[in-house]
Amino acid sequence: VSNKKTEPLMEKIEKHLLLCDNEATSLQYEILAEQLPSMNQRIKDAYKNTREFVNFIHEVLPEAKINFVSKELAAQDFTPSVFSLDLPTKGSTDEERESYKRALNLKLIHLMITEIPNESKFCVSYGQLKGCYWTIPATSTQGTTKEGDKDYIVRASLSGNMDLEKHKEVFLEFVEGYM
């Protein structure tokens, strides 16, 4: 399965799968066949929630740096549900600013998890069916990366099935309490 932009890669992907004996099992194909019909809608819904949440963060915390897909790419159907958030920091030295930012990241994540425990999780998974996952890549997915190259930012992955208004409310509480 591919879109028009990835069609030229399909032959190379097939070759890789054959060489590495890494093709999906029959059970995996069955699961994919079951889930595929609703997958496109779930992707659209997750992107919609993520775009709305990112726009909200821009409104209430404009000095934050957010890495998220551009509207131009999204118009070409590249619609992820993951964004990175680099919170504004304080301090006189680089060390103070970095230390403050790391503590602030954890405060945000813990507040979201504490206030919305049924939907917000401290996790590295993406593409979930429900809720919102939060992580700091430097402490999870970048375990073998050199310390100086690690990203001490917040990364969030939203689904299409979550209480977006509650997440906005708690984020605003964070901004008003800590920023």
Labelled PLM ranges:
Residues V1-K150, S159-D163, G177:
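Active-site C-terminal subdomain of aminotransferase-like
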Residues K166, E173-Y178:
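Terminal helix/beta-alpha structural elements that buttress the NAD(P)+-binding lobe
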